[in-house]
Amino acid sequence: MNKLKALRLKIGKWILDKSSRVNNPQSLEHPKSLLFLRQDGKIGDYIVSSFVFREIKKFNPLIKIGVICTKQNAYLFQRNHNIDEIYLVKKRNILDYIKTALFIRKERYDVVIDPTLVLRNRDLLLLRILNARNYIGYRKADYNIFNINITKDGHFSEIYKGALALSNISLSDDRYDVPQDDLIKKEILQFITDNKLNNFIAINFYGNGKNRKFDETHIVDYLTYIRDSHKHQLVLLSTPDTYEHLSRIATQFNDIFVYPNPHTTIYHTIELIRNCALLISVDTSTVHIASGLNRPMICFYSQDKENFTHWHPNSKNACHIIHYHDNVNEISPREIKPEWLDI
């Protein structure tokens, strides 16, 4: 974090960080409504927290669940029948944050849960306007607005479980709810049938950020190594941005496929992972999807210990992890042991 940004956050905290007007943890004994802040959440964040909404409704179907999110990630929450209210905010638009917060304020939520590590000034302003009865934060002991704080480090699924425990909500099942689209599910099954795919390996060569993207030379090296080690069929997971590039690479090989649609969505990726025998991925969102679907994995993670603690594969299936220092292209494909590819 640069010095100017840190200074802005410090000033914002000094101005905005006030204790909530009603600071009464006793109301957590029987909460009737919970609000989750997910405006910065990505696909992996949703998957990791997906069980929470289900378990709240199992505990008490009458508890109201609200989610604050953006238009970009709303499609994930809109398909979850356990969520009662979705409130949209325009990212980085402080006026829209104020407008939305004033609207939600009328609901007087019993509990607001915000697990984010870095609290931006617009987020802090939103929290203050909400005027909820209780605020549960993660590592927010130095914030006045949070009257309840989770201090224990762990996987973010554990952070959410801790928030539920502090809300006196018990859970019985922490398995992820992986969403699906029935029409796309049929499309992918047809693709698998048409290409006679059996025990195929799904590979995601692109993560979030330039340090987690394989370059073309390394992609070709990995594909060559995997095909030479085992003659498995391979399916490369693409997005609209990577479709043409990966399709061109795939034509250099036999039995390497890209789903033939330049407008693929996360639901195509989910179904390909659901049907694969093994996932190889540098992208944490697909790692979390594979965890939820109980697929074996080979994953690439940086040596950032805090990031790994929060976002490691939370899987009961076989999972092999390769760590890189600065850039995933440091890793030789030969670090994938041949026996890991026995499927």
Where do the model's predicted regions map?
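Catalytic machinery of carbohydrate-active enzymes
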Residues: 1-343
